[in-house]
Design a protein with these regions (language model features):
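Ankyrin-repeat boundary/"N-cap" motif
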Residues: 21-39, 58-71, 86-93, 113-127, ...
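Conserved ankyrin/ankyrin-like repeat signature
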Residues: 8, 43-44, 76, 100, ...
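Ankyrin-repeat-protein effector appendages
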Residues: 76-94, 103, 159-188, 196, ...
Length: 416
């Protein structure tokens, strides 16, 4: 299932018929049945339907279950429909089928407010202006928020860079009257709106995705910006990330020296950071403990240049960040060899080799092992394991990728 190997799945279910009664069980992430977990893969959908998967079985997620048609597109979606999948308003919006959506709304106007996966409304799933217009004409709430991530449709439509995802539709929703907070306005380059907000409250520049009002609020997870923008981004970071230099320039007069330093460091702009310190030599010493988290956040983002710069300037890599991990934990999980090497180049970084985080109780090597299975694709976890062991990390027990397991085995053999 994880490898999306349809041929292997067909062999398994052919040779082991005892697995078939569980085909609709919520065994996969977010309490999803197999068909929801693989709905984006036409070959996997075909195999699962062959063995009796229910094309209408939703995930059993607390905030709202995902129907297979909330995930599938193209050939996979058409196969599900042919197999008897019944589209609701969210699915019709997701599949960009305005005629189907119009017929559903004509039969029951309240469906414009129905809730789908994660508690999203049909507007959250929209893939075209035509569908957006249809929903708004039917009374859709532009600022309705989903249940799990507390976000509007426009906020869901970003995808980390200008023009990616449903960026144009996010712009269109705001043009139609959707509200835009400081993050969305920065991502869309709405300079006048940003300036107006900062005139009212300059402290908005301290806000960060994944923190404060954008943090986890159980049972709700992080605000959707954690995924659609990224973690630990300030409004200035967002404007730069989405390529809105004019919006960024308009923000700078409102920024404090500390905010400017954090921004320069996050950008890896050594020249600007050093210039700020020449003007205010005591700036790093004046940082609040939470300001030092910037180096850990950069490690979590795998930004080796920013990590190296902040360590050089005196930021503390022990400051807990994501899931209470230090900078070394975070860099190890992400698979950034360059970040790990930079951290280990400082005594304060090497001191973290045996530190266990307060959330999972793991060491940096343990985070490396876990990240090798669950972290970003292409991470250099085997190389990181070698670096950590060579620097003095104690051997960890736990699951890891084959490549990391090989490194651990070699180390055990060589240090008996």
């Amino acid at each position: 299932m994880q490898r999306r190997d349809a041929a292997a799945l067909r062999r398994l279910l052919t040779q082991h018929a005892e697995f078939r009664p569980f085909i609709n069980a919520p065994f996969f992430p977010f309490n999803a049945p197999a068909l929801v977990a693989c709905a984006g893969d036409a070959a996997m959908v075909e195999v699962l339907l062959e063995v009796g998967a229910d094309p209408n079985k939703r995930s059993e997620w607390w905030a709202g279950g995902f129907h297979p048609l909330h995930v599938a597109t193209g050939v996979a979606a058409e196969r599900l429909l042919a197999a008897g999948a019944v589209a609701d308003a969210c699915a019709a919006a997701h599949l960009d089928k305005p005629e189907l959506l119009a017929s559903l709304l004509a039969a029951d106007a309240s469906r414009v407010r129905e809730r789908g996966g994660d508690g999203q409304t049909p507007l959250h799933f929209a893939r075209s202006r035509r569908v957006i217009d249809l929903l708004l004409d039917a009374g859709a709430d532009l600022d309705a928020r989903d249940v799990d991530h507390r976000a509007t449709a426009a906020e869901w439509m970003l995808d980390r860079s200008r023009g990616a995802g449903r960026y144009d539709l996010a712009q269109y929703l705001v043009e139609r009257g959707a509200s835009a907070d400081i993050m969305l306005a920065s991502a869309l380059g709405r300079t006048d709106d940003v300036v107006a907000m900062l005139r009212r409250d300059p402290a908005l520049l301290d806000e960060q995705t994944g923190r404060g009002r954008y943090a986890e609020m159980p049972p709700s997870s992080y605000h959707i910006y954690f995924w659609t923008i990224g973690s630990s981004r300030s409004p200035m970071d967002v404007a730069a990330q989405f390529g809105h230099d004019d919006t960024l320039a308009a923000m700078l007069p409102f920024a404090t020296p500390v905010q400017r330093l954090r921004f320069a460091c996050r950008r890896g702009d050594a020249e600007r950071a050093r210039a700020l310190l020449r003007d205010e030599p005591g700036l790093v010493a004046s940082l609040a403990p939470n300001d030092h988290r910037a180096v850990t956040d950069a490690a979590w983002n795998g930004d080796a240049a920013a990590v190296a710069l902040m360590l050089e300037l005196g930021f503390d890599p022990a400051m807990p960040g994501h899931d209470a991990g230090t900078a070394l934990h975070c860099a190890a999980w992400q698979g950034s060899v360059a970040s790990v090497a930079a951290i280990l180049g400082y005594p304060a970084g090497r001191a973290l080799l045996t530190t266990r985080d307060a959330h999972h109780g793991g060491t940096p090597l343990g985070w490396c092992c876990h990240g090798s299975l669950h972290g970003p694709a292409g991470g250099e976890h085997a190389g990181i394991a070698r670096l950590l062991l060579a620097a003095g990390a104690a051997m960890e027990e736990g699951d890891a990728s084959d490549e990391v397991e090989e490194v651990l085995m070699e180390w055990r053999e060589g240090h008996r």
